[in-house]
């Protein structure tokens, strides 16, 4: 289409277009993602020609508490307010989110039933859900032709009642919780989730949540990670594991590497009080050792034991307080403990050797006495026969 240049006078005047403007509902997802500047338009008033208000709007503004009609857009001049009103509006604007109703002064007065409208405003939640859809911003009605207040109130009331009926027909389970952005109920997304994974129980420390777009995911609070699939749904068993379905014991998992079995999935986090005993106990097979195991030599056999430690090992217990053990280093104490064990083993070895020598002496004496008795018996027999 061919466009013609506009003069400065035409540009400065707001365009008055015949017809009725219909507000397009914004998606809740886009409303949460867009900043308040894009949603509600600029808040700085522009210097334009002042439109003469009609008599009905003037009468309505005079009867109210200083609230301006909503069909005046941001193209008007700044409204004169008291300093107290300006401070109150600024505090509300800074403390509340941009999509919530600031105060009772910001609620449009053109609605036919103000009490029912305020009741619906209370449904506005943290994420800007169904309650905020009944609030009309001022900049939407820019350039709209002025009509008597009675006609606008009737049309707005019909529009509000229509949306109110739609909101009542919506299932309550489709709304989001007030505690989070992406937390929704499980009943509203039953057709989007996998019924096979819902039957499986979640391991301890796991929970289910949904994204803003309604996709289900799982949260592992033990490792602070998220996963798209159920932790027990995927059969990605570690190497050496096998899943066994038994009619007697049920379903359990066998670890062929460590020769053990358990009911808990190997990928699930281990909680001692929830772990059940394994149904099968492995009998380890005795394997023949072809090669002898090399044991390292004890370093204390060749170490030189200090004289004071030998004296301490033979001294009575009542003299233990003489040594100041707190002055020794931890590594030195470990070394001296090993040396004391070596002295103890040597003492035991000496005692065993002494007892063994005494036993050998007893056995030798018994053998000698037996031989003597036999010799005396033989000599006595020879004497008696002769």
From Swiss-Prot:
MF (Gene Ontology): identical protein binding; molecular adaptor activity; protein serine/threonine kinase activator activity; transcription regulator activator activity
SMART domains per the UniProt record, alphabetical: WW (SM00456)
Record bears the keyword Repeat: yes
All copies of domain WW, residue ranges: 200-233, 235-268
One cellular component (GO) term of this entry: cytoplasm
Subunit structure: Homodimer. Stabilized through interaction with STK3/MST2 or STK4/MST1. Interacts (via SARAH domain) with isoform 1 of NEK2. Interacts with ESR1 only in the presence of STK3/MST2. Interacts with WTIP and AJUBA.
Functional note: Regulator of STK3/MST2 and STK4/MST1 in the Hippo signaling pathway which plays a pivotal role in organ size control and tumor suppression by restricting proliferation and promoting apoptosis. The core of this pathway is composed of a kinase cascade wherein STK3/MST2 and STK4/MST1, in complex with its regulatory protein SAV1, phosphorylates and activates LATS1/2 in complex with its regulatory protein MOB1, which in turn phosphorylates and inactivates YAP1 oncoprotein and WWTR1/TAZ.
Full protein name: Protein salvador homolog 1
Protein source organism: Mus musculus
Source taxonomy: Eukaryota, Metazoa, Chordata, Craniata, Vertebrata
Gene label: Sav1
């Amino acid at each position: 289409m061919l466009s013609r240049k506009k003069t400065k006078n035409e540009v400065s005047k707001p365009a008055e277009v015949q017809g009725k403007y219909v507000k397009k509902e914004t998606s809740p997802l886009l409303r949460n993602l867009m900043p308040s500047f894009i949603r509600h338009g600029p808040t700085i008033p522009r210097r334009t020609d002042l439109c003469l208000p009609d008599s009905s709007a003037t009468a309505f503004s005079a009867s109210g508490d200083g609230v301006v009609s909503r069909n005046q857009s941001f193209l008007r001049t700044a409204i004169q307010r008291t300093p107290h009103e300006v401070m109150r509006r600024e505090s509300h604007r800074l403390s509340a989110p941009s999509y919530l109703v600031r105060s009772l002064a910001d609620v449009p007065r053109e609605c036919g039933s103000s009490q029912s409208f305020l009741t619906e405003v209370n449904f506005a939640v943290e994420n800007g859900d169904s309650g905020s859809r009944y609030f009309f911003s001022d900049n939407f009605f820019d350039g709209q032709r002025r009509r008597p207040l009675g006609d606008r109130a009737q049309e707005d009331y019909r529009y509000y009642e229509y949306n109110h009926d739609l909101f009542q027909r919506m299932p309550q389970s489709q709304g989001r919780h007030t505690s989070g952005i992406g937390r929704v109920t499980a009943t509203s997304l039953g057709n989007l989730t996998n019924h096979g994974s819902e039957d499986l129980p979640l391991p301890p420390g796991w929970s289910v949540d949904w994204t803003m777009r309604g996709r289900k995911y799982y949260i592992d609070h033990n490792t602070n990670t998220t996963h798209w699939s159920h932790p027990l749904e995927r059969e990605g068993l570690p190497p050496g594991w096998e899943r066994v379905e038994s009619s007697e014991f049920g379903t359990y998992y066998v670890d062929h590497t460590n020769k053990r079995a358990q009911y808990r999935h190997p990928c699930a986090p281990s909680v001692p009080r929830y772990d059940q005993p394994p149904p099968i106990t492995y009998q380890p097979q005795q394997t023949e050792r072809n090669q002898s195991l090399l044991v390292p030599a004890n370093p204390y056999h060749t170490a030189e034991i200090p004289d004071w430690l030998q004296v301490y090992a033979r001294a009575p217990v009542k003299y233990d307080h003489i040594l100041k053990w707190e002055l020794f280093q931890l590594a030195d104490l470990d070394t001296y403990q090993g040396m004391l064990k070596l002295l103890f083993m040597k003492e035991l070895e000496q005692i065993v050797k002494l007892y063994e020598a005494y036993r050998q002496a007893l056995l030798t004496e018994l053998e000698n006495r037996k031989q003597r008795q036999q010799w005396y018996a033989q000599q006595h027999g020879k004497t008696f026969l002769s």
